[in-house]
Amino acid sequence: MWFKNLTLYRFNKPFSVDTEALETALADFTFSPCSSQDISKFGFSKALGKKGSALVHSAENRHLICVTKEEKILPGQVIKEALDEKVAEIEELENRKVTKKEKDTIKDEITTTLLPRAFSRRSQTHALILPEIEMILVDSSSATKAEELLALLRKALGSLPVIPLSFTTPIEQTLTQWLQAGESPLPFAMQDEAELKSDSDEGGIVRFKQQVLQEDEVLAHIATGKSVHKLALHFAQSIAFLMQSDASVKRLKFSEEFRANNDEVSGEDPLARLDADFALMGSELIAFVQALTQALGPMEESI
């Protein structure tokens, strides 16, 4: 339930799909497990997991969705060894070289043979659709996984006019200014971790952890042409996170004190607690994203 990373996108046009219509659209692309010959499967699953019953969990016009991906694990080395063995056998028996086209066919046959016996792994990715601030927040540290989710959502809805979050001033420039000034705009507070990169392609990377970032040792790297590409921050008293220069948010962590706001919700009804946590998280993420976009400056106009 509690998001751990954020890849952020904003709508070019208002999102006006209600819960019922969204549920209906996603239902045509639900997840089903891999069959014996499937390499991978991808689809929407229950937003609240086994305790839920719907693909979309909504409250106050905030929509939580989830995709599940199952992938068969076929180690490349296993396939290579089987391929090499088969090719060597053919070349010895027929006294000729096996062509690339033949190798590709043999490789496909080996994969088909191994698939039914292969182990599989599953992963889930959640996203929060927030029409009130015209954004989608994907709980993933991987831009690829975020784009996969959005691609399936776009397919289900027919269109999805969103673009990655970006700003007129490069984020690394803004983070560098904060570090040089020794403070970030309220309600954000700098912590003790940063990563600096040289502005030149040949330059280096330096990482600081558990260190006062206003010390001369850190500032000297900025003076020699490095910029801050990662910076640990706190938002108010509720969220710790690592801001990245690509506009993604990593290592998002809600404080125990903040999460304790729902401790009075009855533990006898797991769904009631999940619903309360969703409402609490959603409200705070909206406040967080609004403050973050304001602090990082004007967003780039969409094309």
UniProtKB/Swiss-Prot annotation:
It is found in: Cytoplasm, Nucleoid. GO terms for cellular component: bacterial nucleoid; cytoplasm. It comes from the Bacteria. The keyword Transport does not apply. One of its GO terms (biological process) is regulation of DNA recombination. The keyword Cytoplasm applies. One of its GO terms (molecular function) is double-stranded DNA binding. InterPro entries: RdgC (IPR007476). Keywords: Cytoplasm, DNA recombination. Its main location: cytoplasm. May be involved in recombination. Belongs to the RdgC family. This is Recombination-associated protein RdgC. It comes from Shewanella denitrificans (strain OS217 / ATCC BAA-1090 / DSM 15013). The lineage of its organism: Bacteria, Pseudomonadati, Pseudomonadota, Gammaproteobacteria, Alteromonadales. The gene is rdgC.
